[in-house]
Amino acid sequence: MSAILPGYAELHCQSNFSFLQGASHPEELVTRAGELGYAALALTDECSLAGVVRAHVEAREQKLPLIIGSSFTLQAGADAPPLDLTLLAQNREGYGNLAELITLGRGRAAKGQYLLTPADIEAPAGDNAHLRGMPDCLAILAPPPGLAAERLAEQARWLAAQCPGRAWIGLTLLHHCRDDLHRAAVEHAAHASGLPIVALGQAQMHRRSRKPLHDTLAAIRTGRSVGQCGYDLAANAERHLRSRLRLASLYPAQALAQTLAIARRCTFSLDELQYEYPDEIVPAGHTPASYLRQQTYLGARQRFPEGMTPAVAAQVEKELALINELRYEAYFLTVYDIVGYARSQGILCQGRGSAANSAVCYCLGITAVDPARGNTLFERFISKERNEPPDIDVDFEHQRREEVIQYIYEKYGRQRAALTAVVISYRPRSVLRDTGRALGVDNGIIDAVARAHQWWDGKKEMLRSLAACGLDPASRVARQWAELAETLMGFPRHLSQHPGGFVISRGKLSRLVPIENAAMPGRSVVQWDKDDLDALRLLKVDVLALGMLSVLRRALALAGQRRGRPLALHEIPPDDDATYDMICAADTIGVFQIESRAQMSMLPRLRPRQYYDLVVQVAIVRPGPIQGGMVHPYLRRRQGREDITYPGPAVRKALARTLGVPIFQEQVMQIAVDAAGFTPGEADALRRSMAAWRRKGGVDKFRAQLVGGLLARNYTADFAQALFRQIEGFGEYGFPESHAASFALLAYASSWLKCHEPEAFLAALLNSQPMGFYAPAQLVQDARRHGVRVLPADVLYSGWEASLQDAPGAARPAVRLGLNLVKGLREDSARAIEQARVRRPFADTADMARRAGLPRQALDALAAADALRTLAGHRRLASWQAAASAQSRDLLREAVIVETETPALPAPSEGQTVAADYRSVGLTLGRHPLALLRPQLAARNFQTAAVLNTYPNRRLARACGIVTVRQRPQTAKGTIFVTLEDETGPINAVVRPELIERQRRELLDATLLGIYGTWQSVDGVRHLVAQRLVDLSSLLGQLSQDGLAAASRNFH
């Protein structure tokens, strides 16, 4: 049957990258087109190429010709209807023109929108003149049903004139009552213009079963429920990829034949894209290769003042030779230039990831990991066999990274540099809110359901939870809601900007990939994400933000001021016993990487005592080692409870530093090379295939090669199979040793500062917010438990940021909180206070308000935060004086402060003060809220953290505290880890899945949570395994009628 049906190529197809229009993924459309025997498929998302790389990768696997195109609605003016146009790239030149047209339209409009007119094709101006008539693109007029015949004829004549010999008029038949009228109008226009007619499906779904989702997307797009959409919904499900039999029964044979004629003319493939990195940073008289060599050896003199060892020198030469062979010199030099700029501006930066395997990167100052200090594996970074570009990630201070980004824009221009996109996809709460509104569900129920689904366990689990949220799980709307939510989960919602992945080109970047405006002013993004760039082997440089680098620079500066001399990062003693004692005790709140619950649980068991131990510590608390079953064997061997054994000498070479247990990706690769006969490039291909294993499978060939190679070298079958299972456990979650080594440097530096300069460290943490795992309230409480004196924000002493303040007779300074913690206070108001205070002290609130020119809002915020206490007294008095002192904003007359007598107002209670602290500053320096509630909690037998820490293993216990952190790691099989805080410290709790389902609302909604359970204390790791949860948030109302505004950090 298939052989006698007319051939067909779908030339107008929109995926879900036509956001809230297409109801199928690009891959689904490609796969379905192949199943239906289409000759080709054109992906034509609206003014976008965001989905084409995904379609390209799938089409390559399906061996289906993919046509690259895009659809547009050209705004023809108030008196004319819009013109719907589809453009298809014939060749590389046509593709570049198409990408530039998309860039032009997107650049004129706000993020997520575009604006193009017929004039942009008929007579484009200036630098876009070459786009006139869209050379090397085929054009199809795609009129909507209902367009008047004469209007359509006019549009057809215009298109025929603009694209002679390259234009068609599309006929779309959707089994609609207007099909005959539409066909007549199209035939009339074709006759009037001389354009041939081509069949178009205008598909937006791969199967008709997506029609309910298609309707839901229309409702979301228009902000109404499905029931209110009426004619905005498609009349039927015909906008799917239809069978050739169905198409043959609807369309004239000639219209179907034209689809094949057009497909034959479109020969362009994304594989043709060639990317050239900029080379202007190479000075005259040098080639990129000679300049890279010169700078590498100049850097080596600084890195190795006593000279490189023969092994390092050989490694440098090996790397330079491979970089030259693959022609990556300009890429390395570009990153080198960016890092050099940052350092010239005093911005801390450090390379990480696989780049830390490179001796060249170390010599250039891009990375900080000495290749002579670890087991680096350059093939993890660059491999000739892999034939994929290297990826250099560089972290910069998060508060100054924008300076680096603007340097790149200024150096290369916005036509040659743009950020990589990130596809923002539907997640549980956004899915449930949008689909719930589309179905007309009550807003109260939607909010309750969304709050109860911080993660997604599938529609069955959703239905089980609906009853507690006020909806019958057996109702039709509940079943529809669950079905739609599961289908929409993971759909792209819009494009955002990557944290810092830059694409920089030698020529015009918009001819390689379309560029559009970002939401943030001064930023532009390409329409592809990092996976798209990787799939096409396009280079990018990651200019990433890392809060801890900001902390380190600030803390070193503050510590240097206290010591009377500058303190640099490299001056931190490398093997400080006190620092490692603190780390082994899991006293790591606020430090880098080892502050999470999982890391803190591991520290007392692994007990790091040197730098490489920290490298292992950073890497071992990852899904890869955990899923691969490597954690417990390593710990048993480290603690002397299990013998260290190796299956053979070749394996010993790779695993000696980790006690015979593979922890790092490089070790997996090294075993494949040393013990199974892989080349280094094949070994990295094995690692990368494991990253895709969970998504696509396809590692059987590596299984055979690895197991066969090991058996051929006399390793046992049991070992070979066990090793492969461990490798599978890594998946995409294993840490490269080079990455862990980079992070371990920062983990140690931050730990040393916390141990020896706790005041500077706390101030730096507060001044670098938002960042890290803990909120300022927890950071301050932890510092105070360690003896750090913290003083409140005060207009007489505080600057915008936290600072160190000496006190007479005190051995160490106190930390004075900054005005940046005051909610509702702008920085310019705080700076004005500082400047006015320098001239002379303030006499009173009115004097401060007048001299600093403060608006009423700023005065109210300062009063609420108790920052006027030394000028005005307690909060109530301060609020009265703030109102009396507010300057008139009338610019026509001089501001006058009216003298009024302050009434005798009672001071707020201690509970009211604490509650007001949390509302206005986010923390309190008074007694902890639970200290005030301790009598009530003691009456219910809730114990403090200090008491619980004395309990033996397996004792029944009760704990209560303010929820500060909720976590649900991927490897925990649905378990949630909760951190509570009381007046004596943190309490770690474990909540199992069966309890979560019974008490989801208490777990997710409570601010003050009581937990009944069993205390566990093993090897210095202590936590409470929950058996029952109680929401005690109502007790906080005893402090203040507004409760306590204590925020937790959830599911980071």
UniProtKB/Swiss-Prot annotation:
Disulfide bonds: none annotated. GO terms for molecular function: 3'-5' exonuclease activity; DNA-directed DNA polymerase activity; nucleic acid binding. Belongs to the DNA polymerase type-C family. DnaE2 subfamily. InterPro entries: DNA_pol3_alpha_NTPase_dom (IPR011708), DNA_pol3_finger (IPR040982), DnaE2 (IPR023073), DnaE2/DnaE/PolC (IPR004805), DNAPol_HHH (IPR029460), NA-bd_OB_tRNA (IPR004365), PHP_dom (IPR004013), Pol/His_phosphatase_N (IPR003141). GO terms for biological process: DNA repair; DNA replication. This is Error-prone DNA polymerase. Its EC number is 2.7.7.7. The keyword Nucleotidyltransferase applies.
